Amino acid sequence: MNTKILAGLFSMAALFSSCNDFQEINEDPNQVDESKVKPEWFLNASIVGDQMNPEIAERMFILTWNRASRFNRGSGFTIGTDNNDYITRYLSNDYAVKWLNQATKAVQLGEKKVADGEADLYPYYKNVIQMARIWRAYLNSEVSDGFGPIPALDAFSGVPGEYDSVEAIYTFILKELKEAEAALDPSIDMSPMSAEDAFYAGNVNMWKKYANSLRMRLAMRIVNANPQLAEREFEDAASKGYISSLSELASVQEKDGWSDLTSVMSRTWNAQAMSVTFKNLVVGLGSNEFPLPDSLKAHLKNPHTYMGLYLDRHFPLTTNDPCAGFYFDGVPQYVDPRAPKLFSVVGWNDGVVYSDYIGAASEVKPVSLFDPDDNTKPMLTIDPRYTWGTWVAGEWDVKGSLATELTGKNYNYPSMSKQYRMSTQKRVYFGPWESYFLLAEAGVRGWDVPGSPKSNYENGVTASFEYHGLLSEVGAYLSSTEYNRIGTSVSFDHTTEAKPYIVNYVDPYTKENKTMTYTYPKNSIYRGGAYNNDAMTKIFTQKYIAQVPWLPEEVWSDHRRIGLPFFENQAVEKDYNPLNQVPLTVATSKECRLEFYPKRYRYPANIQTNNLEGYNKALELLGGPDVVETALWWNLK
């Protein structure tokens, strides 16, 4: 594996577009005069490329990873419908294959130049080799975590190689990370290549921390498949320096325009509406009040005592969302304080969070819901202005046409904050909160790691609050025992399970105030559904919120390996098509099963055509058919 690189079974394309001197190079990698180029150019081209230009970012980050992780509301891959066009583009010489080729070329070219004695003139080449190995390890995880076994190509020879199993890939990348981190030499002057390192500007100590944090992440990933190796690798990585502060973020600076550095969330037509998963996790979590100006505070409503309008004739009930059928006609008074910084209030342009990409706030108007017995006749009027709620996607069947004036407009949903859409941020690949939440999980598992589960959990929350400029609010938040919609509280020591209780709601059809028993969901794929407030659920609730909006593939991977946090089913007003959707039916719509969530995406269709033998070998290593429900080696089974 260490002499191979990932490749699609496609023709080799021209090489890169990078920056600085490397912009002048536009040749096949086999034909590049190696005396003209430096290994760091290949490394930086790979890092910058993986930032994703708008074409591939929309297809993979927004429409695939964000759907899989429930960062955004939507159907598509959320319900198991992958897109062959998206996947084919991603696993091509324009994108993922190129990035891996570039990373491997950086390793190989660096090794050749060192062997040829050039390290006497350019000693920093020795470190560039290790940096490229670390980055390649990440890329291998990014690609294989989506597909499973991936094809390999002997280094730039153009000859298709055999597929590697996920187990072999993970064994390789864990070894690579350990060796590369140990080989990095902080005493070497890296200033000659600092402009060619989009991550850390040549800071070797930061690369060492990134390597250790990444090894912690990937070791924990395989805890179900090889617990002994996972524990051994994790403990070793955790005993060294890891990303523990915001100054150590592994991140890439965005730039406006259309390039690899354009924000992955920049496309104006992508609504990026708040999902029910996110809403259920943050509403009621903590005792912090939603920050609204005095002029809008009349719209605050207590989510602990009030559910909203029960629109059972217009909203689907065929879901295990505990808020099924309800429309929250206001702003929840108590939410996780990070949530209002991430998603806008409907109809309120605060100048900071609200993005007019979804339409001007002034466009939000009262809408009609139509009569189920006569879908041309308005039955109810709903005013979405100054609300903060959402509802499941999926198959609404006839109910979809009755509520389309509400559900069919992007500006009727809380949507992703403007600041993340303007290409002015740094795209985060690894934050300090993740290191701490991984350590907290390891501690709960009884592993030998620094800090206690509680201290690491609280450090993770604190790091996330600091990222959002909310440090002053974290103290009260960490002591809160209030439950969110799932039945999880913040306080690490508060593990009492939430019980059903009576809440108020409004019947909009009769205009009556009524009560009902609110029942928390049963997450059957985690510990049999008996726990919503144990230590692990708290850790993964906080980890999920902290990873928004930058790390959707990681959240998807977490859910695939442990079943946390709770992911509700989307609406199933009619049975799903098992040929291109997860196998949900009306009868099973309220159940929680592993097969109701996509585990991977299918291989590009042209691989079957171009290399049937290799494709069949991949399926043999995968251990199942080429469908989204087939679990990867490390998945929860």
Provide a role label for each language-model segment.
Residues 447-528:
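Acidic/aromatic/glycine-rich contiguous surface patches that form carbohydrate-binding/processing clefts
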Residues 142-151, 221-227, 447-449:
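Short coil/turn linking the two alpha-helices of tandem helical-hairpin repeats
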Residues 70-190, 422-427, 633-634:
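Conserved, well-structured interaction surfaces
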Residues 311-444, 455, 459-462, 475, ...:
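Flexible, polar/acidic helix-loop-strand segments at domain edges
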Residues 19-69, 355, 576-637:
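Membrane-proximal, proline-rich intrinsically disordered regions
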Residues 1-27:
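Bacterial Sec-dependent N-terminal signal peptides
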